[in-house]
Swiss-Prot record:
Any one GO biological process: proteolysis
Keyword tags: Hydrolase, Protease, Thiol protease
Family: Belongs to the bacterial sortase family.
Phenotype of gene-disrupted mutants: Mutation does not affect extracellular levels of the sortase substrate YfkN.
Record-annotated site: Transition state stabilizer: R87
GO molecular function: cysteine-type peptidase activity
Disulfide bonds listed in the record: none
InterPro entries in the cross-refs: Sortase (IPR005754), Sortase_A (IPR042007), Sortase_dom-sf (IPR023365)
Induction or repression: Preferentially expressed in the late stationary phase.
Cross-referenced SUPFAM superfamilies: Sortase
Location of the active site: H17 (proton donor/acceptor), C78 (acyl-thioester intermediate)
The protein's name: Putative sortase YwpE
Length: 102
């Protein structure tokens, strides 16, 4: 979402679709709980984040993708699986990273 973003460094924002099929793409985020793990990989390293917050914001509030000094992930999707102006934002803090294995 930003040219300068890097996994494991600063704010790493990702956006995905929220479909009517609740188990696809970012649909399951509506049920995520604080403390849940988010795992992403660049196939060199795996990054584990712990969910710290879940909020609904306006689609116009783009500040959530801005760089921060925290090592965090920001997941963004529509708050409903229909046309909506709300965005579900899930934030997590980096808790670990390690070499990727197949």
């Amino acid at each position: 979402m930003r040219r300068d973003q890097k996994m494991g460094e600063g704010n790493y924002p990702l956006a995905g679709h929220h479909l009517k099929q609740k188990n696809l793409l970012f649909g399951p985020l509506e049920n995520i709980k604080t403390g849940a793990q988010i795992v992403i990989t660049d196939f060199k390293k795996d990054y584990i984040y712990s969910v710290t917050s879940k909020d609904i914001i306006s689609e116009m509030d783009a500040d959530v993708v801005e760089e921060t000094n925290k090592k965090e992930i920001t997941l963004i999707t529509c708050d409903k699986a229909v046309k909506t102006e709300g965005r579900l934002v899930v934030k997590g803090e980096l808790v670990d990273s390690f070499g990727h294995t197949n």
